[in-house]
Amino acid sequence: MPKDKALKKVMVIGSGPIIIGQAAEFDYAGTQACRALREEGLEVVLINSNPATIMTDANMADRIYIEPLTPEFVAKVISQERPDALLPTLGGQTGLNLAKQVADAGILDQYGVRLLGTPLESIKRAEDREHFKNMCLEIGEPVPESSIISDVDAAVAFARKIGYPVVVRPAYTLGGTGGGVAFSEDELREIAVRGLTMSIIHQVLVEKCVLGWKEIEYEVMRDAAGNCITICSMENIDPMGIHTGDSIVVAPTQTLSDREHQMLRSASLKIIRALGVEGGCNVQFALDPESYDYYVIEVNPRLSRSSALASKATGYPIAKVATKVAVGLTLDEIKNAVTGKTYACFEPALDYVVVKYPRWPFDKFSLANRNLGTQMKSTGEVMAIGRTFEEALLKAVRSLETGVTGMNLPELREWDNDRLRARMARPDDLRLFLVAEALRRGFPVNEIFELTRIDRFFLDKIKNITEAEELVRAARPTDVGTPTGVGAPAGLTPELLRRVKRIGLSDTTIAELVGTTSREVHRLRRELGVEPVYKMVDTCAGEFEATTPYYYSTYEDEDEAEPQAVRKVVVLGSGPIRIGQGIEFDYCSVHSVWALKEQGVKAIIINNNPETVSTDFDTADRLYFEPLVPEDVMNILHKEKPDGVIVQFGGQTAINLARPVEKAGFNILGTSVADIDRAEDRERFDQLVAELGIPRPPGGTGFSVEEAQRIAEQVGFPVLVRPSYVLGGRAMEIVYNSQELLEYMADAVRVTPKHPVLVDKYLLGKELEVDAVCDGETVLVPGIMEHVERAGIHSGDSIAVFPPQTLTPEIKEQLFEYTQQIARALKIRGLVNIQFVLHEGRVFVLEVNPRSSRTVPYLSKVTGIPMVNLATRICLGATLPELGYRGGLYEETRNIAVKAPVFSFAKLLDVDVCLGPEMKSTGEVMGVSKDYALALYKACLSAGYTLPSSGKAVVTIADRDKDEALPLVRSLVNLGFEIVATEGTAAFLRSRAITVEVARKVHEGSPNIVDLIRENRIHLVVNTLTKGKLTTRDGFRIRRAAVEMGVPCLTSLDTARVVIEVMRARQRGETMPLIPLQEYVS
């Protein structure tokens, strides 16, 4: 069936900001979809609120609207653009929910827009728990005993009937938001309240819990003619009870018999046919390990995180094929772009093993609850490919960049067996390391199985890893007199090395086991000829020649990667998405690859994140799906011998590799390693700015607790303290007295024992940020960004405004001058990011990042300057004047663009939501308008602030902020809010003639402030931090209750000020014109 001729213009809904549960996989899917539609000659209109994505680039669609993803704005775009059809299945849960809302509101009928791909009825059948359960029963597919509930008492009654534990799954939510496993009535009541609040249709499913059964997933594809194929089967290493996004997943399935595989494959095809899905779909099963019993758990009738994994694991471009199916093509008409010969109706075949490992944010949130359940907590993931499960697992662990290179966590050696058993029985992020430690201690596999319910097959594989460690340890020299690091012991024979490398042990692990250095092991391996070969991912297990191959390393004989003798450059990617290093860096890597290809240079990318555009099969000329650690990167560089390596686009991950790459004799393009170090090393940077005469907050480096105390007293409290070399402000804090400093030193200096702690005077003032492009001489500043929140709140968590609204021309000129002096002094070739603070009328420099930053995509879009393209061409030797740009501060645009952070606090219980120098946001959105208040309004709306127009506002303010807060409270009263406060703040406000309702503090009994919030009687919370992060404090409890009940919670007076401005704009009822990206800069 050929393409539908009636279609001329298609609208695509993106998935919005990155949050836990919905990450970069939808940028990758959306980018593929937009390209596929344009390949078919269609005009494409896109709406998405996330400026950090590739899909919102001007060349990806004909008209791009970076607008809030709300029914109102989707309707506005439909009315303005009049598309023939809407494609919602590539925008994650957000896209599906919006499609349902605009369809239910009659918008699609009004404008004659039809839904492409999976019909709305099918979406409802799959997403609505009751419809889905009934459909499964009709076609004879088993589902767990369950009940659809819309009030808490009904949930309790049903649980009494079927017995605990039970699972709560809210309808139409993402990443298990609001769900959980309840083992008692109290737990059920708490989870049910949260789940009903989070579901857009106020509905949850309570079902029998099959904890301990295997969790199996099938990724399937169907076209309108009814042709169905399974693309990939996946097995969660963790049993049922843990959200699949938080599970370690292996593809293809490893422990199913052929009968089990055929049984579940047939069931998934039967379900997709009954649903009438057109496109990609993911089916999840629970399988009893002791019998052939199974249950259908759920279906995603859209592209999902699992589809991204299945796509990268098999090389089958699911999003592209799903899009072509949506416009009417059938699977036997769509060519497989990887082979160029086969068609999309061929099921992929795998001759390797893939492991996906989640990346959790517990390094940022040390107080968060690390236990894993049905509510997702990971921010990103890595994928690794090997010939054996062991090899793929160890590569995945290396890829996480948590400082661990094998299955060995030194701190576990201190634990006794009882503690080990207790922790193994409760799933958390350390579980596999606990299993490995138990195996080293001789625990029987059966006992570990009973504790964890992880299949014995996987436990045996982990045992193979611990036995390989023993073989290496036995090669350690016995005479203690041998100094370590002098050379590798003779016991490391080529046979032993080859054997343990096949299992996946890293050079670092081997070095630790025999008491030498990883460089020494690397040298020995190369000397003995024990080097990896590279195999191809080609969708067909080598049956057909692949034209767009990508590679993984393994220790076998036959090599499939022939290096080409052409001009080529390696771009180092940014690895998994985590707080502090998000999709922005993937955006930069991809743009760098495109710039290289434009210049006729072969582009090679190394990355390990399955969710991203950079790891798509046709982004680079060559893709290596490998860990971004020195060993794996050097192996590739020795193989490819590139003309140069670009490190400035992969965030701190790539910057950290610059020195090892240079030491190994490879050429770093762009800013030199020595100059990168001058920017990042505290003392050398201080010296540089002192020579240039640029003011900097006074401070120093403390190598001991006493020294840090002395510096703090010298410069005067408050001070900002942090370890040297950090990303995302990890373990940074503002401390107000010497007692707090001592507490910080006790907790945080352990972060990097080798590195000292930096102590700076904390200057209160406006934070300003500059991204610049420099060719070593000419400096171009596309724009200055002004932060709404004052210095002291991490730049990634601040609302940024461009162009700046309150700066004088003199200050702007001074910012440019300082940027130019610093960029020239550091001999920057490429991008640089500089942060300043305006304190009492003077500009001080805070820090310099000699690389791309998280604001580059946002600034590139709103100014129209292709910053990454220019920086890449400078790396290749061009100058700015040759590229048509003279230096200076670029002319400001008429439109105002506001970038706002997005947080995932609802997913992370026990995490404080207050803002500070430690970054906490997972994503970002943008609002654009000619009017500042409207741009702010759009940004707040996109960021998910459900702003009330009136109601009750809780105001609890720290003493030092009370005077400053007064005008804000008056504004709230003028807007029609009633003020609620605890005794201290209430007395202060009353003395200033403001009417206040007094509420109890938490420890004063009920009903207190937290009770009022939980009873939905509060509509806004303004709460500034009183010192102390303890989770028992009132402030912490108020903030957490607000997040869990979906009440806007403002912890910075600066944010509160702009939010009040937004409420005013909304009350004025101003109209909001839509501006497509293509018209921003014209």
Curated annotation (Swiss-Prot):
Region (Allosteric domain): 945-1082
Cofactors that this protein relies on: Mg(2+); Mn(2+)
Region of interest (Oligomerization domain), ranges: 402-561
GO cellular component, one term: cytoplasm
Region of interest called Carbamoyl phosphate synthetic domain, as start-end residue ranges on this chain: 562-944
Residues reported in the UniProt entry to bind Mg(2+) 3: Q835, E847
Ligand binding (ATP 1): R129, R169, G175, G176, K208, V210, E215, G241, I242, H243, Q284, E298
Primary enzyme class: ligase
Annotated metabolic or biological route of this protein: Amino-acid biosynthesis; L-arginine biosynthesis; carbamoyl phosphate from bicarbonate: step 1/1; Pyrimidine metabolism; UMP biosynthesis via de novo pathway; (S)-dihydroorotate from bicarbonate: step 1/3
SUPFAM superfamilies from the UniProt entry: Carbamoyl phosphate synthetase, large subunit connection domain, Glutathione synthetase ATP-binding domain-like, Methylglyoxal synthase-like, PreATP-grasp domain
Binding residues for Mn(2+) 4: E847, N849
Sites where the protein binds Mg(2+) 2: E298, N300
Binding positions for Mn(2+) 1 per the UniProt entry: Q284, E298
Protein family membership: Belongs to the CarB family.
Function recorded in the entry: Large subunit of the glutamine-dependent carbamoyl phosphate synthetase (CPSase). CPSase catalyzes the formation of carbamoyl phosphate from the ammonia moiety of glutamine, carbonate, and phosphate donated by ATP, constituting the first step of 2 biosynthetic pathways, one leading to arginine and/or urea and the other to pyrimidine nucleotides.
Domain notes: The large subunit is composed of 2 ATP-grasp domains that are involved in binding the 2 ATP molecules needed for carbamoyl phosphate synthesis. The N-terminal ATP-grasp domain (referred to as the carboxyphosphate synthetic component) catalyzes the ATP-dependent phosphorylation of hydrogencarbonate to carboxyphosphate and the subsequent nucleophilic attack by ammonia to form a carbamate intermediate.
Full protein name: Carbamoyl phosphate synthase large chain
